[in-house]
Regions:
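Membrane-proximal helix-turn-helix segments that form the acceptor-binding/catalytic region
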Residues: 79-82, 128-146, 155
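An aromatic- and histidine-rich active-site surface loop
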Residues: 69-82, 86-115, 277
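Aromatic "clamp/platform" in nucleotide-sugar-dependent glycosyltransferases that forms part
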Residues: 274
Length: 295
């Protein structure tokens, strides 16, 4: 089959959960003999990169703005996919649901992976929240199939929209390699640091984690792994709160083998998110057998 994946920043993954999902899904589909194209954003993947591990990459522009980045790129991706006549398309993020009509209208079957309850995120103004609620409803109407990644999200769509969805839980790739020298790059010792991984946005409660850790009397360190492209003020506030406590270390985004080394050598993992879907980082921490503290 010829399959298109739309609605993420693209692959190779170096941002968040949907990108990690798209990379794992696309490469596994290719390994099974399918022809897969992942649509990527030009400020995230080089336009010169045409392929990744057998997956075709189509890099398109977008408008780099908090409210437009995702939907503009998904719209352009859907338009580009029409003449390609894919056998199936997967759209990530309920925000992109309106564009399912473009593909279905030209005969391409469409599934949407809706993610979490984005309308509850504080980063959106009232108009953004209203749009997300509309897009949620459309994600139960326009595609051929609505996909949820957790039972609680499946139950939400059933209760709010009386909509059936297919729940497909994420897995985690666990490869144990005691790569201890890697973690020392961040001035930590194996099994002597607490790991927090997330996009640094208010609903993921990095502020709460930092303030709680500051009250703990311990020589262990806190590694804050993550970033966010449109949350500079919030991130600066986090770093200001951590100022003076040398135990708290901000790493930015970490992916690949370095990230896996951080997971498998952590003393424990802290999960403090409120409104997202299933976070791959949580599953990976569980897969590595980490002690997990949840909000």
């Amino acid at each position: 089959m010829r399959i298109a994946i739309l609605g993420t920043r693209g692959i190779p993954a170096s941002y968040g959960g949907f990108e990690t999902f798209a990379e794992h899904l696309s490469t596994r589909l290719v390994a099974r003999g399918h022809d897969v194209t992942v649509y990527c954003r030009a400020h995230y993947v080089s336009p010169r990169q045409l392929e990744s591990h057998g997956v075709r990459l189509k890099v398109l522009p977008t408008i780099r703005h908090k409210y437009l980045d995702t939907v503009v790129h998904a719209f352009l991706s859907a338009l580009h996919a029409v003449p390609a006549r894919f056998d199936a398309a997967l759209i990530c993020n309920a925000a992109n649901a309106p564009f399912a009509s473009i593909l279905r209208g030209t005969g391409t079957p469409v599934a949407i992976n809706v993610d979490g309850l984005e309308h509850k995120r504080k980063k959106w103004n009232w108009l953004g929240r209203k749009y997300y609620l509309l897009a949620e409803r459309l994600s139960t109407i326009l595609p051929n199939e609505t996909v949820t990644d957790a039972c609680v999200i499946q139950d939400y769509y059933a209760a709010k929209y009386n909509a059936r969805s297919t729940m497909i839980a994420y897995g985690a790739e666990v490869e144990r390699k005691p790569d201890r020298p890697v973690v020392r790059r961040w001035r930590v010792e194996p099994n002597r640091y607490v790991l927090y991984v997330s996009r640094l946005e208010p609903e993921n409660n990095a502020r709460m984690v930092i303030e709680a850790f500051k009250k703990v009397r311990t020589a262990y360190r806190l590694l804050v792994v993550g970033d966010a492209p449109y949350a500079h003020e919030y991130i600066n506030d986090l770093k200001e709160r951590a100022r003076g406590d040398r135990r708290i270390i901000f790493t930015g985004f970490v992916f690949g083998q370095d990230y896996r080394a951080l997971q498998q050598n952590a003393y424990c993992y802290v999960h403090a998110t409120e409104v997202g879907g299933t976070h791959p980082a949580l599953l990976e921490a569980m897969g590595f057998g980490n002690c997990v503290l949840t909000l």
